[in-house]
Amino acid sequence: VHVDAAFGGFAALSPEHAHLIAGWEMADSVTVDNHKWLNVPYDSACWFIREEHLPLQSATFQNSSAPYLGDPAADFNYLNVGPENSRRLRALPAWFSLHAYGRSGYEDIVTRCIKTAFLLGSALSEDPAFELLAEVKLNVVAFTLTDAAPERINALVQRLNDRGRYFLSPTTLFGRRGLRAAFVNWQ
């Protein structure tokens, strides 16, 4: 079983929301997108895999087809068990960010972002011009204009994004066009 914990993995840092990922430690593998909440470049992520699945990971991602890399089973090197091989060191920005903020710093960021999402969700539910497309559970709020054509929703996304203070993305959820606000800001 694989768990895609792109956003959800960070719920572990929030005592109030850690229950949302209960049982993830039983998964065979887990991915977490560092760029979602660690304030690092877009392509930074982690993939955690159980040790007993290392042969499968090696077979899937081994870069040993080049003779000069040798046999990954005989001479284990993390270089040979990831898809990137010789590309840039994406872990360094994540390490610096983790070192700078620490667990308590990220707990504050995650908790604040979740609270902000719940505040927005609450405000939107009370306004008859808006409708939530899904219950707010973490840091993402999916909503739409009540009885609005997709063109109006797209125009609202553009108008809000043109302000330059935040970025909302258009989305479609359960066949309905809407907006998506994902709170991940460290400020």
Go through each PLM region and give its residues.
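Catalytic PLP-binding core of fold-type I/II PLP enzymes
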Residues: V1-S14
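Conserved PLP-binding catalytic core of the aspartate aminotransferase-like
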Residues: F130-L160
